[in-house]
């Protein structure tokens, strides 16, 4: 919110003409631990996509609210949820990947697969990973793919939003193929990274090299920022509702994910296996590659 609506720099670029795709990743290295019984009745879609990932999407895609009032903000977020491209049985098969982790190495240590976790049924079809493609069907975002991804036992603990900009319309420098990228870091660091192209100036030629402008908020403010849960508790005590979800937002989010759950209930194939310590099933990479893009860690 502060990045978008407190700074004039990005607003002229925050639209389909300048942005190629947006990626939202909520990755965990941990498994289900002792929560196997609870998690098996929930899964990654309900646990993370329906709420956390969609809330991040709405804040990235929303129109500027008329004020910093909670309802003004939530009205705009609701418009985004209503503009999300609805899923059909066919589009779920094409645009949604679900996975389940198997035994592997995570954080340098061997870990069991999901089916070997405590209180998890040995024949469970519960998903521990979801990657999906969607679009916001309005004038600002028409045609821009939004990729959402979450999972357990992945290669790193990483929560971030990656805004990939379009390349320049006419390239005059040789070999300059990487477009600009803005990375909004949420966990484990809290900061921003803007990736640009620049000339090294160390020799002949005009070859451009990727460089990053990296901002760590803790270092910039010379203090550790309040954590996400602490921030919510402080806002609740103060009666500030800007970050809290309104009931109509919640209902619309459930309407959007329900067709995915219904399609999975009729699909006998179950989730795709992926090794603990990886970035999920290969189909998740193929999902993005189909549009000519790649996940941030693959570029």
Language model features with spans:
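Secretory/organelle targeting and membrane-embedding segments
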Residues: 1-299
């Amino acid at each position: 919110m502060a990045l978008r609506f407190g700074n004039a720099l990005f607003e002229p670029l925050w639209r389909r003409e300048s942005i190629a795709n947006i990626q939202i990743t909520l990755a965990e290295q941990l498994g289900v631990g002792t929560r196997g019984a609870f998690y098996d009745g929930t899964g990654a879609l309900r646990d993370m996509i329906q709420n956390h990932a969609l809330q991040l999407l709405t804040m990235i895609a929303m129109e500027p609210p008329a004020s910093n009032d909670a309802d003004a903000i939530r009205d705009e977020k609701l418009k985004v949820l209503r503009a999300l491209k609805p899923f059909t049985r066919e589009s779920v098969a094409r645009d949604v990947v679900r996975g389940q982790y198997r035994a592997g190495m995570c954080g340098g240590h061997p870990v069991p697969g999901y089916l070997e976790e405590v209180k998890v049924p040995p024949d469970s079809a519960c998903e521990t990973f979801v990657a999906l493609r969607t679009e916001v069907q309005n004038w600002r975002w028409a045609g821009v793919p939004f990729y959402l991804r979450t999972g357990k036992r992945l290669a790193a603990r990483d929560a971030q939003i990656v805004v990939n900009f379009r390349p320049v319309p006419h390239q005059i420098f040789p070999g300059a193929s990487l477009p600009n990228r803005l990375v909004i870091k949420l966990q484990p660091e809290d900061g921003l990274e803007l990736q640009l192209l620049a000339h090294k100036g160390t020799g002949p030629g005009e070859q451009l090299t990727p460089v990053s402008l990296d901002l760590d908020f803790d270092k910039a403010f010379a203090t550790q920022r309040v954590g996400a849960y602490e921030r919510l508790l402080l806002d609740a005590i103060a009666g500030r509702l800007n970050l809290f979800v309104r009931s109509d937002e919640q209902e619309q989010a459930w309407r959007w994910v329900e067709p995915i759950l219904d399609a999975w209930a009729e699909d006998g194939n179950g989730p795709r296996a992926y090794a603990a310590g990886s970035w999920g099933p290969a189909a998740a990479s193929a999902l993005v590659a189909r549009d000519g893009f790649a996940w941030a860690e693959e570029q």
